[in-house]
UniProtKB/Swiss-Prot annotation:
Subcellular localization(s) per the UniProt record: Cytoplasm; Cytoplasm, Cytoskeleton
InterPro entries referenced in this protein's UniProt entry, alphabetically: C1-like_sf, PE/DAG-bd, RA_dom, RASSF1-6, RASSF5_RA, SARAH_dom, Ubiquitin-like_domsf
Organism in which the protein naturally occurs: Mus musculus (Mouse)
PANTHER family named in the record: RAS ASSOCIATION DOMAIN-CONTAINING PROTEIN 5, RASSF
Function (record text): Potential tumor suppressor. Seems to be involved in lymphocyte adhesion by linking RAP1A activation upon T-cell receptor or chemokine stimulation to integrin activation. Isoform 2 stimulates lymphocyte polarization and the patch-like distribution of ITGAL/LFA-1, resulting in an enhanced adhesion to ICAM1. Together with RAP1A may participate in regulation of microtubule growth. The association of isoform 2 with activated RAP1A is required for directional movement of endothelial cells during wound healing. May be involved in regulation of Ras apoptotic function.
Keyword Metal-binding attached: yes
Residue span, Ras-associating domain: 265-359
Residues annotated with Phosphoserine modification: 177, 274
Residues where Phosphothreonine is found: 347
CDD domains for this protein: C1_RASSF5, RA_RASSF5, SARAH_RASSF5
Primary residence: cytoplasm
Record protein name field: Ras association domain-containing protein 5
Length: 413
């Protein structure tokens, strides 16, 4: 029996996508086994009729086979019920296959909340308008606030709250993040305003301060001075937000393309959800010497995809002195990196804290003229409602007094 031709198998395949092809036998009349279905035999490797079949010739033919052309390969038939997939090269990156047997709205691992545990009391906003944690709109003069978790909202938004109180059993406690356990805690009962007189330094003084700062920095987060006199560096901001924040619901995280093209994923949906951030979470930002406090707040909200108004928040600088903690609210035009440069890299000397803007100071210059006119319209409406309620209250009181007087006139006194 003649040996099979080069590139053939001595046994038939069971799943051949096409009828087997036979080549001319080298020495006998018996047809060789069927050819390999996914491989094409080059013409140069097929020996002519009457060629020598010695062992050396076969070895030389097997030793240096030519590469198989891609067009001669036959694709495997796709099994019914499966989608065709591309075959990746060996060693190439394979995307992670993450699947879930649950749909997002029906995921049993996500506990359903119904707005339970809140203990709302009336709050008078004397310093200026506040912000509703549910709808995000301004709250003027009168609001409702939970005594436990500080959730603030309009009176008409009370029935629409679905977020449970995180401190149902009592007053709000600090739910700290893992980063906060690495730093010692001091007495934070003292909050005073610290006023400092600062003079703009020269470029030579800035260079000396940057060299001194980098020599004391131990985490490779130094500052770099540019030729135009500006410099860049890192700051850490502690997030101490007791009230919930609002984020868009049902969208994917921000990709590199969105960050480069400045695409806001929150603008693609109108669905909103609220949750509580861990107290004292730490976020690191890379900013320049021209970055203001307002830009730092907007950058933090963008990183967490928070859609609340930036005026709802304020940036404070925290100074540790004599075992006490002194807070000072920074103006929206201050430069945090310059303050970091003056204080040095030690966070025990100076640190930045993001909190709710509830100091009673309102930046009226940040509002547009239509917004200010809207404030006046809402205030006038609330004033008329209060006047109507007072008139109705005292009218009922007068009617009861008159009825009591009429009843007392017929009785001997």
């Amino acid at each position: 029996m003649a040996s099979p031709a080069i590139g053939q198998r001595p046994y038939p395949l069971l799943l051949d996508p096409e009828p087997p092809r036979y080549l001319q036998s080298l020495g006998g009349t018996e047809p060789p086994p069927p050819a390999r279905p996914r491989r094409c035999i080059p013409t140069a490797l097929i020996p002519a009729a009457g060629a020598s079949e010695d062992r050396g010739g076969r070895r030389s033919g097997r030793r240096d086979p030519e590469p198989t052309p891609r067009d001669c390969r036959h694709a495997r038939p796709v099994r019914p019920g499966l989608q065709p997939r591309l075959r990746l090269r060996p060693g190439s990156h394979r995307p992670r296959d993450v699947r879930s047997i649950f749909e997002q709205p029906q995921d049993p691992r996500v506990l359903a909340e119904r707005g339970e545990g809140h203990r709302f009391v009336e709050l008078a906003l004397r310093g200026g308008p506040g912000w509703c944690d549910l709808c995000g709109r301004e709250v003027l003069r009168q609001a409702l606030r939970c005594a436990n978790c500080k959730f603030t909202c309009h009176s008409e938004c009370r029935s629409l709250i679905q977020l449970d109180c995180r401190q149902k059993g009592g007053p709000a406690l600090d739910r700290r993040s893992p980063e906060s356990t690495l730093t010692p805690t001091l007495n934070q009962n003292v909050c005073k305003a610290v006023e400092e007189t600062q003079h703009p330094p020269t470029i030579q003084e800035i260079k000396q301060k940057i060299d001194s700062y980098n020599s004391r920095e131990k985490h490779c987060l130094g500052m770099k001075l540019s030729e135009d006199g500006t410099y860049t560096g890192f700051i850490k901001v502690h997030l101490k937000l007791r009230r919930p924040v609002t984020v868009p619901a049902g969208i994917r995280p921000q990709s590199i393309y969105d960050a480069i093209k400045e695409v806001n994923p929150a603008a693609t949906t109108d669905k909103r959800t609220s949750f509580y951030l861990p107290l004292d979470a730490i976020k690191q930002l890379h900013i320049s010497s021209t970055t203001t406090v307002s830009e730092v707040i907007q950058g933090l909200l963008k990183k967490f995809m928070v859609v609340d108004n930036p005026q709802k928040f304020a940036l404070f600088k925290r100074i540790h002195k004599d075992g006490q903690v002194l807070f000072q609210k920074l103006s929206i035009a201050d430069y945090p990196l310059y303050l970091r440069l003056l204080a040095g890299p030690d966070t025990d000397v100076l640190s930045f804290v993001l909190k709710e803007n509830e100091t009673g100071e309102v930046e009226w210059d940040a509002f547009s003229i239509p917004e200010l006119q809207n404030f006046l319209t809402i205030l006038e409406k609330e004033e008329q409602d209060k006047i109507h309620q007072l008139q109705k209250k005292y009218n009922k009181f007068r009617q009861k007094l008159e009825e009591a007087l009429r009843e007392s006139q017929g009785k001997p006194g």
